[in-house]
Design a protein with these regions (language model features):
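Membrane-interfacial terminal anchoring regions of lipid-handling membrane enzymes
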Residues: 1-170
Length: 170
């Protein structure tokens, strides 16, 4: 829907490919070992999954930004790709291409594999992390999720394991 809105003003005069190629989309992926807002995100997702209304507090977004900037993130990686070359005249195909481009750049962290281990999610051990790095991340995640309601814990772990699962589909 967002791509359609971006193209809206020029839809009649220029094709999807030509327009998006003229904008020079450059994929960027930021990955970090730990998300300081992981519990907040899991709580919000859980409330929505349970069809409960989630009411943000007045300064919740501001607090999330502050926490995201100043909170513990462990290892951080920023990857900047090359301009995306659009070849299909479809918003859906364009969105998939953008997603795939970002995923290819995304650097997995020990916490991603540790979450898979905790969840018993199978993955290809296609990484260069030591057993100790994975173990340390696992200990961190186990402490982080201690005392959380099982549904919230599962959603938090999924935030970490999902990049491994999605990258394995590439």
């Amino acid at each position: 829907a967002l791509l359609k809105m971006i193209h809206l003003i020029n839809r009649k005069s220029i094709s999807i490919c030509d327009y998006f190629n003229s904008l020079c989309f450059i994929p960027i992926a930021v990955s970090y070992e730990f998300d300081p807002n992981d519990i907040f995100k899991a709580n919000e997702l859980y409330a929505l999954d349970m069809h409960q209304e989630y009411q943000k507090t007045d300064k919740e977004d501001l607090n999330s930004i502050t926490n995201g900037i100043s909170g513990q993130k462990g290892m951080v990686n920023l990857s900047i790709g090359s301009p995306i070359k659009f070849t299909k005249e479809s918003y859906e195909d364009s969105a998939k291409l953008i997603t795939r481009s970002i995923l290819q750049l995304y650097k997995l962290q020990p916490s991603n594999f540790a979450a898979c281990d905790i969840e018993n999610t199978a993955y290809k051990p296609d990484h260069n992390f030591s057993e100790q790095q994975i173990k340390s991340a696992r200990v961190y995640l186990e402490k982080r999720t201690q005392g959380l309601e099982p549904g919230i814990k599962a959603l938090l772990l999924k935030q970490y394991s999902n990049p491994v699962i999605e990258k394995s589909k590439l």
